[in-house]
Amino acid sequence: MKRGKLIVFSGPSGVGKHTILSKIINRKDLNLAYSISMTTRKKREGEVNGVDYYFVNDEEFKKAILNNELIEWAEFVGNKYGTPRTIVEKLRDEGKNVILEIEVVGALKVLDLYKNDDLISIFLLPPSIDELKKRLLKRNTETLETIKKRIQKATHEITIKDYYQYNIINDNPDHAANQLAEIILNEIKQS
């Protein structure tokens, strides 16, 4: 069985990463597995532990770092996010193409760590910073101060888009999802 690819899919908070992935994750031709991240942030309404994230406390997260159990991790606005190593490697060994939906800081670590591996890197961009701000406000899950910090961070993150193999502008979720699927299919066919 051929080992699966590692797909790094990142972009600013609120750009629509989760929405886009939900449109293609179950496509059989892509053979995708979603890498579930570990986080110390509070669970949002409707989120399920072990499905959306592994929600842990700060002590459990620190232990995972010390035991080298995370491929990458980053902290933002007091919350930590990381990718559990054993889950990703197990899925790839099973032939699955594993999608890491991660923050830009963590993504850059993965791009460096796996640069000689079967890696696909895709950066999702908003049509504009104003549109991104509207999306974050529409979520209605964070304070205005947190949204301001996310916009500042996004402005910086967008400058890093050229570190990725592919860029997709999310001006329409269906169109962006189709672009993402096409990129993955083309990369699978080339290997």
Swiss-Prot record:
InterPro entries linked to this entry: GK/Ca_channel_bsu, Guanylate_kin-like_dom, Guanylate_kinase, Guanylate_kinase_CS, P-loop_NTPase
Protein name as annotated: Guanylate kinase
Binding annotation for ATP: G11, P12, S13, G14, V15, G16, K17, H18
The species this protein was found in: Ureaplasma parvum serovar 3 (strain ATCC 700970)
Predominant location: cytoplasm
Record keywords: ATP-binding, Cytoplasm, Kinase, Nucleotide-binding, Transferase
Enzyme Commission number(s) of this protein: 2.7.4.8
UniProt cross-references to SMART domains, sorted A to Z: GuKc
Domain Guanylate kinase-like: from-to ranges: 4-185
Broad enzyme group: transferase
Lineage: Bacteria, Bacillati, Mycoplasmatota, Mycoplasmoidales, Mycoplasmoidaceae
